[in-house]
């Protein structure tokens, strides 16, 4: 039975969810503030410190552009580097606390995007509350305080979602904005290249199925896609070519499938692989069902976002499966895509179907349980990670995987001597969880 509307229900179903949402965001922010370290971690050294050193030592615009566009592992991180540099110029030095805070702003930005997509105005806050509980949990603990990784794994979706929002019911101005956002998504992390495929499908569907926009949008997007990806791959040195990765996938299809499904369902698995894979299958079934059912009726921005998340996760699985065990799909850095997919599938269902308030309350309770349990389950793992970071910092060691310690230590020492980075006094205390 539907719960009746009234003055009392307005407090219960509008103001109370708003207060609970603010509480969840505040707790996450407090946790972030308590544990923030102004100390570089792994890729921070090569992607942040090395960038500022190279830009400051550059002789002209050409070498500056080269520093911003330079390859980092299999990625190009221009979008993140622009923010690093602006932050550095404003503060006068690199501050990794500041960068971590800016990186985590991706969460409220995405949450606001999703809030605007809720159709049920009377139950809007009750529908939105599970979104907040899912997004502001501790599942991504491994990248929460790791500036470079947080920018890459969080903002690839900020830019990608913004691009899709612009392409939906596209105009010339929105098309231009979508190209810019898609470019930024691509230059956040390699998986952001998936936005060009989903963007093309979005335009083709609007043009040839719904007949809402001219065909030239699809053609223009396709041409720009080829140009951007050609530039991206120009002088890109990597053994992980697309052809090589496809050969790996064809050789071990079961492992790749298990890895991919594990990633998709990792948001609520608490690192139990078979639970993650089950949830991944369930999410895919729901998404496929809705996609087929509404092919002629049209898709919302949320549905296109779902497919961007799925395809970007597939590219990550394609690149990581050959070099790691299936259980590695439960690593915290790869869970953000799953969190967003759960959120978007939830919004898709609540927009398509009228959900009784009693069922919304059940979903709210379930998401609140996941959020609370994430702090209980992942805080000890987070504390171990922070202990290792502090111990490494206090020893004066700046380790980066695949790099000689003498090289990375020299980069940090050079940044310190030039006033680019000022480390906190040693010994640095381990941040305590209160």
Outline where the language-model segments fall:
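Membrane-interface interhelical loops and short amphipathic "cap" helices
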Residues: 250, 254-264, 321-328
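Juxtamembrane "helix-exit" motif on the non-cytosolic side of transmembrane helices
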Residues: 87-90, 116, 136-146, 230-240, ...
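Hydrophobic cores of alpha-helical transmembrane segments in multi-pass inner/ER membrane proteins
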Residues: 109, 157-168, 196-199, 262, ...
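Membrane-interface micro-motifs in multi-pass membrane enzymes
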Residues: 43, 122-170, 187-192, 309-349
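Active-site/pore-lining binding-face segments in mid-to-C-terminal subdomains
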Residues: 181, 313-392
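Membrane-interface alpha helices of multi-pass inner-membrane proteins
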Residues: 174-202
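Transmembrane alpha-helix segments characteristic
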Residues: 24, 128-135, 180, 222-226, ...
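Intrinsically disordered, polar/acidic, low-complexity terminal segments
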Residues: 4-8, 12-128, 170-173, 191, ...
């Amino acid at each position: 039975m539907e719960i009746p509307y009234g003055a009392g229900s307005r407090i219960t179903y509008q103001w109370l969810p708003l207060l609970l949402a603010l509480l969840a965001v505040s707790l996450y922010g407090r946790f972030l503030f308590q544990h923030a370290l102004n100390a570089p971690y792994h890729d921070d050294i090569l992607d942040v410190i090395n960038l500022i050193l190279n830009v400051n030592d550059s002789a002209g615009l050409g070498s500056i552009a080269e520093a911003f566009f330079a390859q980092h592992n299999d990625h190009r991180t221009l979008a993140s580097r622009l923010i690093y540099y602006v932050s550095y110029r404003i503060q006068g030095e690199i501050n990794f606390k500041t960068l971590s805070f800016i990186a985590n702003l991706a969460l409220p930005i995405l949450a606001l995007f999703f809030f605007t997509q809720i159709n049920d105005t009377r139950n809007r806050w009750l529908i939105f509350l599970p979104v907040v509980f899912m997004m502001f949990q501790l599942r991504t603990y491994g990248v929460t305080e790791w500036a470079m990784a947080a920018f890459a794994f969080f903002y690839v979706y900020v830019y990608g979602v913004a691009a899709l929002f612009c392409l939906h019911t596209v105009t010339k101005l929105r098309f231009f904005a979508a190209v810019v956002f898609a470019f930024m998504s691509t230059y956040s992390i390699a998986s952001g290249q998936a936005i060009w495929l989903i963007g093309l499908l979005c335009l083709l569907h609007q043009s040839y199925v719904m007949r809402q926009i001219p065909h030239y949008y699809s053609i223009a997007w396709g041409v720009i896609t080829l140009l951007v990806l050609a530039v991206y791959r120009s002088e890109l040195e990597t053994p992980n070519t697309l052809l090589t990765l496809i050969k790996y996938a064809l050789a071990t299809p079961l492992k790749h499938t298990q890895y991919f499904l594990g990633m998709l369902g990792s948001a609520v698995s608490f690192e139990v692989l078979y639970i993650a894979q089950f949830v991944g299958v369930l999410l895919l079934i729901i998404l496929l069902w809705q996609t087929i059912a509404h092919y002629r009726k049209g898709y919302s921005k949320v549905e296109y976002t779902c497919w961007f998340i799925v395809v970007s996760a597939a590219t990550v699985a394609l690149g990581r499966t050959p070099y790691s065990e299936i259980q590695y799909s439960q690593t915290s850095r790869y869970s953000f895509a799953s969190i967003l997919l759960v959120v978007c599938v939830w919004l898709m269902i609540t927009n398509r179907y009228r959900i009784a308030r009693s069922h919304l309350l059940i979903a709210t309770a379930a998401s609140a349980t996941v959020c609370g349990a994430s702090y209980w389950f992942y805080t000890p793992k987070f504390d171990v990670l922070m202990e290792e970071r502090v111990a490494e910092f206090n020893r004066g060691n700046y380790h980066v995987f695949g790099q000689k310690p003498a090289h990375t230590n020299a980069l940090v020492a050079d940044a310190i001597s030039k006033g680019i980075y000022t480390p906190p006094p040693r010994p640095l205390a381990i941040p305590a969880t209160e």
